[in-house]
């Protein structure tokens, strides 16, 4: 264990000594970065802010080096979470590549994902895990095409829950198929976790009806739940978390409800009526307030007030994966990707700590890259 004192004070809160219980599990070079992150977040926080850690697209089985750096980052997250006043930790999906085609491939895949959950159980804060398009192991069919829709290799919804949010069930209110919400105590804020890989796992003759490699999107049941259950709390702030947002259409069909979700977000943020397909909700007198929508998937970084979504603050965190194979999926609209990651130093890491208030969002970078902000003028 490593102890370090900090005497920062903010709004009458004084930071106590910092105890890095996981310091044996990441490089020595992380320690200064952890202390800097804790202090920066503490200085940014106010009584009306929400703060959280967001790490995404780890793809930890890309190489042994990638896996090692991913675990380093997860243990660092534990120490930051446990020595700060952040409100929660979110894993944004695509935790691995989902290509285990061995006869026991599903077991290997589930063990890989659950190893992440087990580390994050060391956090004394809520943990939310989002499902990405790679996470059901259906990309095993890229290794062996005979495994297309093969239920023996694809992680179904019950199995997904057992290796992810079952470990954090107290933070998964009204859990459905990878989507759920949580009300942050004392903060008048509801966090809504969505599932862009909401595939139908009905099995017929050994074949699953849909799978993550081919189905991107939100079933009608999820949209109905979002409108009538998740967004039903009055007079509170809302944060939406999902593996993907709206800028990269590849993988989505016309039945994916992707555009429906975007229209809901725009209407909720601007307090205007929404109607699309068979869904409708008049947000004109809705008493909720949408703070932001945060995602990954593109392996690129960006924070904007998105004009195509009614001016909604959209945050996109780039991939935390340490690999020469790492690349981004958007080359326009202001997306970017940090370079210069160096193994064995803090720059091998990359995740964001967000401190959010209405129209005022600070993004604190752990690892390579710089802190930045999104503020309405």
Model-based region annotation:
Residues 12-106:
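N-terminal active-site segment of His-dependent metallophosphoesterases
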Residues 30-37, 101-225, 307-316, 320-342, ...:
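Extended active-site neighborhood of metal-dependent phosphoesterases/phosphodiesterases
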Residues 51-55, 87-92, 97, 126-131, ...:
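Structural recognition of the beta-strand scaffold that forms the well-ordered cores
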Residues 61-64, 97-100, 131-141, 199-204, ...:
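Active-site environment of divalent metal-dependent phosphoester hydrolases
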Residues 105-110, 200-224, 231-292:
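Active-site-proximal segments of metal-dependent phosphoesterases and phosphodiesterases across multiple
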Residues 253-357:
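Conserved beta-sheet core of the metallophosphoesterase superfamily
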Residues 365-375:
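Short, solvent-exposed aromatic-acidic interface loops
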């Amino acid at each position: 264990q490593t102890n370090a004192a900090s005497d920062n004070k903010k709004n009458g809160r004084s930071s106590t000594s910092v105890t890095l219980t996981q310091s044996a599990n990441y490089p020595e070079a992380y320690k200064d970065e952890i202390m800097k992150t804790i202090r920066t977040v503490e200085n940014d926080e106010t009584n009306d802010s929400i703060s959280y850690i967001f790490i995404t697209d780890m793809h930890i089985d890309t190489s042994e080096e990638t896996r090692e750096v991913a675990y380093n980052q997860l243990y660092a997250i534990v120490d930051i979470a446990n020595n700060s006043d952040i409100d929660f930790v979110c894993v944004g999906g695509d935790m691995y590549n989902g290509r285990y085609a061995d006869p026991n491939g599903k077991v290997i895949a589930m063990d890989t994902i659950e190893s992440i959950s087990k580390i994050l159980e060391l956090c004394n804060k809520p943990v939310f895990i989002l499902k990405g398009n790679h996470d059901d192991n259906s990309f095993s069919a890229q290794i062996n095409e005979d495994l297309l829709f093969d239920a023996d290799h694809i992680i179904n919804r019950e199995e997904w829950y057992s290796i992810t949010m079952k470990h954090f069930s107290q933070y998964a209110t009204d859990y459905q198929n990878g989507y759920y919400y949580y009300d942050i105590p004392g903060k008048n804020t509801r966090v809504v976790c969505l599932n862009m890989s909401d595939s139908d796992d009905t099995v017929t003759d050994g074949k699953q009806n849909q799978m993550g490699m081919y189905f991107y999107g939100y079933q009608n049941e999820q949209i109905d739940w979002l409108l009538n259950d998740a967004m039903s709390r009055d007079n509170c702030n809302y944060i939406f978390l999902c593996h993907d947002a709206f800028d990269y259409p590849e993988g989505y069909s016309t039945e994916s409800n992707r555009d429906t979700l975007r229209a809901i977000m725009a209407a909720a943020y601007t307090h205007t009526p929404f109607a699309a397909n068979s869904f409708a909700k008049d947000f004109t007198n809705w008493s909720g307030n949408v703070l932001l929508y945060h995602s990954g998937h593109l392996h690129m970084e960006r924070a904007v007030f998105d004009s195509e979504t009614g001016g909604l603050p959209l945050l996109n965190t780039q991939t935390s994966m340490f690999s020469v194979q790492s690349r981004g999926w958007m080359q326009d609209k202001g997306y970017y990707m940090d370079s210069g990651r160096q193994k064995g130093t803090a720059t091998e890491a990359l995740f964001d700590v967000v401190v959010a208030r209405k129209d005022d969002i600070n993004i604190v970078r752990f690892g390579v890259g710089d802190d930045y902000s999104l503020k309405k003028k």
